[in-house]
UniProtKB/Swiss-Prot annotation:
NCBIfam families, per database record: atpA (TIGR00962), PRK13343.1 (NF009884)
Gene that produces this protein: atpA
Function noted in UniProt: Produces ATP from ADP in the presence of a proton gradient across the membrane. The alpha chain is a regulatory subunit.
Keywords: ATP synthesis, ATP-binding, CF(1), Chloroplast, Hydrogen ion transport, Ion transport, Membrane, Nucleotide-binding, Plastid, Thylakoid, Translocase, Transport
Keyword Translocase: yes
Organism per entry: Ranunculus macranthus
Catalytic reactions on record: ATP + H2O + 4 H(+)(in) = ADP + phosphate + 5 H(+)(out)
Family according to the record: Belongs to the ATPase alpha/beta chains family.
EC class (word): translocase
Protein name: ATP synthase subunit alpha, chloroplastic
Subunit details: F-type ATPases have 2 components, CF(1) - the catalytic core - and CF(0) - the membrane proton channel. CF(1) has five subunits: alpha(3), beta(3), gamma(1), delta(1), epsilon(1). CF(0) has four main subunits: a, b, b' and c.
PROSITE patterns documented for this protein: ATPASE_ALPHA_BETA
Length: 507
């Protein structure tokens, strides 16, 4: 048996004494009084900040939301099934933040920016606060560049600009998500980073959206943030802020970003659940008093930055679900008053086969034609006017039996214009194609066709124009104007294609 000599023992003790480093660590701790329903009440934690992250003994993390005189109300960012009454909790000294980097592009993540697509970790050197202040007045400039959605009804009559916030509102199953996802598909090749935030949706719906993005090849410039219906309320409440933090990261790096919140009604419901469990006083529809601030501080982060900050932009398309078309409910009116306009989707139009089911009469963009190229302004003004007159006449024509020829012609034109606004899902059109379509309709070239032939003719016309008159597209994309030369080319193409089409139909 080996024996230790006295001098060896003294050397070991001497080394230990020399290596001893006295370090005092002050940790702010507390004790769990009560836990359940995703909420924990903590005694102690005297110096905790509002919104600070706290860590439980079994490593669950929570956010301190209610700072009361004798306890702290914490919402859990996990199920917290292993937390026990009497266990200790420590304050971390950090406000909620997430890592950010270019590597997030093409990934599906949760509200804590952790990947959930099974493709391994994401490397990130920087981090951003989930809740950051919105850009101030001096940091912004007015919206002037178009954010093309690829949908004629929107780009012509309810134009969206880069840095705008445009609400998409409507009942369930009216195509709200389809409008938003088509807008993402249309950003292909436009150098726009897209963030799609899914809040409280079915996992199957989110999977369907991600599959569409992958098939269409748009995942390379898109980040999907998903918290499904079975996620804790805290994470559903945080998901939009996580998406905003990622979009901001790119915006401040002089890039253009588009963020979709699908949908904010679910976020408000998650926040209502948390607030009621924290015993905050309920207000209208049992929502807490600060539910307006919940959405305003999120949507104000969308901006068009000034030239001094690099002219980056963040365009927000929040989605809100209504109950049987009631836009005067609490959350819809709140979000309408925060955003720069709304696109109203109607269940009646959807069921009658008009898709996208946009009710042009009550939809509005408060940025207006500032967010359109000159060519679009030139052709879209007439379209708006004719559709408005058609809507008026249509209501009147239901009661009048004998209509004069002019009124009949106007009704026929209106029906064809309504037909040209119809589009299939995942088939966005370029601006040049939209200008062609609108010009053909408003100048009466479709009047001689049957309503059922309109769509087929327009598809063939766009293909024919691309192959036989490529200079038309060059003129519009380079000058952004519908010049006389472009008009001559278009008229020729319409006449040539009309002759071919009518011959085709006869045979």
């Amino acid at each position: 048996m080996a024996t230790l000599r006295a001098d060896e023992i003294s050397n070991i003790i001497r080394e230990r004494i020399e290596q001893y480093n006295r370090e005092v660590k002050i940790v702010n701790t507390g004790t769990v009084l009560q836990v359940g329903d995703g909420i924990a009440r903590i005694h102690g934690l005297d110096e905790v900040m509002a919104g600070e992250l706290v860590e439980f003994e079994e490593k669950t993390v929570g956010i301190a939301l209610n700072l009361e005189s004798n306890n702290v109300g914490v919402v859990l960012m996990g199920d917290g099934l292993m937390i026990q009454e009497g266990s200790s909790v420590k304050a971390t000294g950090r406000i909620a933040q997430i890592p950010v980097s270019e590597d997030y592009l093409g990934r599906v993540i949760n509200a804590l920016a952790k990947p959930i697509d099974g493709r391994g970790e994401i490397s990130a050197s920087e981090s951003r606060l989930i809740e950051s202040p919105a850009p101030g007045i001096i940091s912004r400039r007015s919206v002037y560049e178009p954010m093309q959605t690829g949908l004629i009804a929107i780009d012509a009559m309810i134009p969206i600009g880069r840095g705008q916030r445009e609400l998409i509102i409507g009942d369930r199953q009216t195509g709200k998500t389809a409008v938003a996802t088509d807008t993402i598909l249309n950003q292909k090749g436009q150098n726009v980073i897209c963030v799609y935030v899914a809040i409280g949706q079915k996992a199957s719906s989110v999977a369907q959206v991600v599959t569409t993005f992958q098939e269409q090849g748009v995942m390379e410039y898109t980040i999907v943030v998903a918290e499904t219906a079975d996620a804790p309320a805290t994470l559903q409440y945080l998901a939009p802020y996580t998406g905003a933090a990622l979009a901001e990261y790119f915006m401040y790096r002089e890039r253009h970003t588009l963020i979709i919140y699908d949908d904010l009604s679910k976020q408000a419901q998650a926040y209502r659940q948390m607030s009621l469990l924290l015993r905050r006083p309920p207000g209208r529809e049992a929502y807490p008093g600060d539910v307006f601030y919940l959405h305003s501080r999120l949507l104000e982060r969308a901006a068009k930055l000034s030239s001094r900050l690099g002219e980056g932009s963040m365009t927000a398309l929040p989605i809100v679900e209504t109950q049987s078309g009631d836009v005067s409910a609490y959350i819809p009116t709140n979000v309408i008053s925060i955003t720069d306009g709304q696109i109203f989707l109607s269940a009646d139009l959807f069921n009658s086969g008009i898709r996208p089911a946009i009710n042009v009469g009550i939809s509005v963009s408060r940025v207006g034609s500032a967010a359109q190229i000159k060519a679009m302004k030139q052709v879209a003004g007439k379209l708006k006017l004719e559709l408005a007159q058609f809507a008026e006449l249509e209501a009147f024509a239901q009661f009048a039996s004998d209509l004069d020829k002019a009124t009949q012609n106007q009704l026929a034109r209106g029906q064809r214009l309504r037909e040209l606004l119809k589009q299939s899902q995942a088939a966005p059109l370029t601006v040049e194609e939209q200008v062609v379509t609108i010009y053909t309709g408003t100048n009466g070239y479709l009047d001689s066709l049957e309503i059922g032939q309109v769509k087929k003719f327009l598809v063939q016309l766009r293909t024919y124009l691309k192959s036989s008159k490529p200079q038309f597209q060059e003129i519009i994309s380079s000058t952004k104007t519908f010049t006389e030369e472009a008009e001559v080319l278009l008229k020729e193409a319409i006449q040539e294609q009309m002759e071919r089409f009518l011959l085709q139909e006869q045979t």
